[in-house]
Amino acid sequence: MPHHHSLPTSSADFGDFNSAPASSIQTSSLSQDDLLGSYDETIRHSPSVKSHPSPDPRASNLDLLFLDHNAEEHRRPEPTYSPRSRPTGVLPESVPHARSPRRLSTFSSSTSPTSPPSITDAGCDIIFHPFYDHMDVNATRAMQKMQGHGERGASKRSDKMQLRGQASHSRIAPSSSPPHSRLLDTLATTTKLASKWRSVIAHPTSPNTADQTHNGQPKPQIRHAETSPMDITHDTPFASAEQIAGSYIPPTGAPGFTQASVLGMKHHGDGPFEPLTLIGRKDSTSNVLTPEDAIGLKACLPPRQRLTNQWTLLFSLDQHGASLSTLYRLIDIYSVSHQSSGNILVIRDGHGNRFGTYMNEPIVKREGTYYGSGESFLFKLTHSCQTIPYRWTGKNKYFALCEAGFMSFGGGAGAYGLILDSTFTHNSSATCPAYNNDILCELEPLKSQHAQSFQCLGLEVWSTL
């Protein structure tokens, strides 16, 4: 090999240094296409990579300062790759461990940062994760031999794996259980607790376990007699003896209130009502309602309307004239200061029959709408000063319909219990579903939806408060 002498070279910046000797070996130059295409060629020819001896290190010393980019013949040789060496710890014939045919459960551990991991026995079996030691070749071969056994040896292999897993479990950190494993553990714990409670309830045990006598015979169980229900002897302030016995009287205005219940009612103990005073009627006025009739009507009124012993005349056909508008106006004036007052309208026809209606509120004009409540009723007055009321049936709520041209009380099915026009000249009565009343202008009881007309010779409206 020829000997080359280094040429001394100086520089103001770096000082004295010697240049590298020129190589006698012809170097190959790389072009831009070579650098870009080398990677593609490597990928394209990767399946057929051949091993080549590594080039001489002396030939790799290229003079990068004198590259010839125009020389096509000097290209970079194709890269060569040597196959990766096989690890010495793994045998070529080693295969992954096959899954055991026996179904095993997993440990479940808590990964809470504030508490130590807790291990539960949810499935009553312990799963073993084999600890592979890559350096233990004999153990690997032994496991491969065990893989070839059939179902008869599977149980033995599982037992050995469980024993080995228990021994090596202290070295293996428990992995965090998935969410569904924690849910199954919770359900299993809850089921166990529930079964324990059921067993305790079904078979109660006393704290004293010594349930046997000195002779060894069990003690007889003592049954306690059941307590008989106590008889309640005191009276209740919410119901009378008659109501408890089944003779309940419905309140006034409620469906089912009958005349028999009215006759059996007691007022102020066993004595009659105090005398009722009728005010506002002139002495020269022909009366329609007498004080005796008023006492009978008062017994049919709601309890709050019985508190007063004085009724006030609001309208009289004999005193104020035959005008429905006047009737509305006078009642409206009085109701301003007596809003809770009820009104009683009493009529006398050409045959001397007296009848009318009670409204739990003032009789006023309300165009196109019914008003009133179940306390309202129609009534007839007999010649013996007895009152026959016709209570609300609950079939509808057509209590009163008062407009400028007429006023009616009770309705349904095209029939009106009592209807009067604006001049009180065209009037009629029929059986209506709201009250199921008899025809009011008939002396004898008669029910018919065919209206019977009558002449209005007298009409009065009274305020009960």
From Swiss-Prot:
GO terms for biological process: response to oxidative stress. The keyword Mitochondrion applies. Residues 287-465 form the TLDc domain. The keyword Mitochondrion applies. Keywords: Mitochondrion. Residues 20-32, 165-179, 205-218 have a biased composition (Polar residues). May be involved in protection from oxidative damage. Belongs to the OXR1 family. This is Oxidation resistance protein 1. The gene is OXR1.
